[in-house]
Curated annotation (Swiss-Prot):
<dbReference type="InterPro" id="IPR029057">
    <property type="entry name" value="PRTase-like"/>
</dbReference>
<keyword id="KW-0328">Glycosyltransferase</keyword>
<dbReference type="GO" id="GO:0006353">
    <property type="term" value="P:DNA-templated transcription termination"/>
</dbReference>
<dbReference type="GO" id="GO:0003723">
    <property type="term" value="F:RNA binding"/>
</dbReference>
<keyword id="KW-0804">Transcription</keyword>
<feature type="short sequence motif" description="PRPP-binding">
    <location>
        <begin position="98"/>
        <end position="110"/>
    </location>
</feature>
<keyword id="KW-0808">Transferase</keyword>
<protein>
    <recommendedName>
        <fullName>Bifunctional protein PyrR</fullName>
        <ecNumber>2.4.2.9</ecNumber>
    </recommendedName>
</protein>
<dbReference type="InterPro" id="IPR000836">
    <property type="entry name" value="PRibTrfase_dom"/>
</dbReference>
<dbReference type="InterPro" id="IPR023050">
    <property type="entry name" value="PyrR"/>
</dbReference>
<dbReference type="Pfam" id="PF00156">
    <property type="entry name" value="Pribosyltran"/>
</dbReference>
<feature type="binding site">
    <location>
        <position position="135"/>
    </location>
    <ligand>
        <name>substrate</name>
    </ligand>
</feature>
<comment type="function">
    <text>Also displays a weak uracil phosphoribosyltransferase activity which is not physiologically significant.</text>
</comment>
<keyword id="KW-0694">RNA-binding</keyword>
<dbReference type="InterPro" id="IPR050137">
    <property type="entry name" value="PyrR_bifunctional"/>
</dbReference>
<comment type="function">
    <text>Regulates transcriptional attenuation of the pyrimidine nucleotide (pyr) operon by binding in a uridine-dependent manner to specific sites on pyr mRNA. This disrupts an antiterminator hairpin in the RNA and favors formation of a downstream transcription terminator, leading to a reduced expression of downstream genes.</text>
</comment>
<dbReference type="GO" id="GO:0004845">
    <property type="term" value="F:uracil phosphoribosyltransferase activity"/>
</dbReference>
């Protein structure tokens, strides 16, 4: 199957810069702002956005990761280990503005699982969602507050995000 590049390295960098600015506008600065990246690529994107916000505001926004494995609705007996915190961050996120970062927004089920994981133990002031790519085909009433690129796709197509931290290149492709 051939690969069609939708975003190259430069486009990804511009997109991250724009999303960082949009998050700052949404929150009116960095006060009480926390970024949580969904493992794996969302976590790397969250750190890139953190770096960009730091370069804009000279403020290091607390950033962590969220592992939704035990909150997925396609896994049997999810609740058995759901009592453990699914996120790794060194600040209390109660009464904070949390922005969840994901690489590709598709059906909405990953985001629903991340909301379940967060709300099981904490009560943020507000939760926002940033996605590098929104490919449509939602199964749940979920939308991103910050979208890098809307990419209309067929259900049988695959959108892949490659990040140099784990893939040795930066690109978004349709396969």
């Amino acid at each position: 199957m051939s690969e069609r590049i939708i975003l190259d390295e430069a486009a990804i960098q511009r997109t991250i810069t724009r999303i960082a600015h949009e998050i700052l506008e949404y929150n009116k600065g960095t006060k009480d702002l926390v970024l949580l990246g969904i493992k794996t690529r969302g976590a790397f994107l969250a750190h890139r956005i953190q770096d960009k916000i730091n370069s804009i505001e000279q403020q290091l926004v607390p950033t962590g990761t969220i592992d939704i494995t035990h909150f997925r609705d396609d896994v049997d007996k999810v609740v058995q280990q759901a009592d453990q915190y699914a996120f790794d961050i060194n600040v209390d996120i109660n009464n904070k503005v949390v922005v969840i970062i994901d690489d590709v927004l598709y059906t909405g089920r990953t985001v629903r699982a991340s909301l379940d994981a967060i709300l099981l133990h904490t009560r943020p002031i507000k939760i926002g969602l940033a996605a590098l790519v929104d490919r449509g085909h939602r199964e749940l009433p979920i939308r991103a507050d910050f979208v890098g690129k809307n990419i209309p796709t067929a259900r049988d197509e695959s959108v892949s995000v490659y990040l140099e931290e784990i893939d040795d290149r930066n690109a978004v492709v349709i396969e």
